[in-house]
Amino acid sequence: MRVGGLMKKVKKFKYKRVRLYWQDIVSNPEWLTLAKAKDQMYSWCEDTGYLLHKDQKKVIIFASHSFDDDGELSVGNTTTYPRSVVKKIEVLK
């Protein structure tokens, strides 16, 4: 990476680009019959980013990254999901 005319050593980028498929809650402020209320469904969602962390409790991705002047990686636009709502993680090329 070139900074101010000097080449800085950048550490290897080791994070995989992924697409998450996850379920989100849906709320409705309207008055509904019981039958219509029971027919409501949750929402299927997709997000893409770089996989920062995954364990049995949570999944964390980030969408933006930058290497600081000293070569350290900084990340932005992080999203943390409860593991229970993430239904599939697809590694992208």
Give residue spans per PLM region.
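Conserved RNA-binding domains used in RNP assembly and mRNA/RNA metabolism
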Residues: 2-93
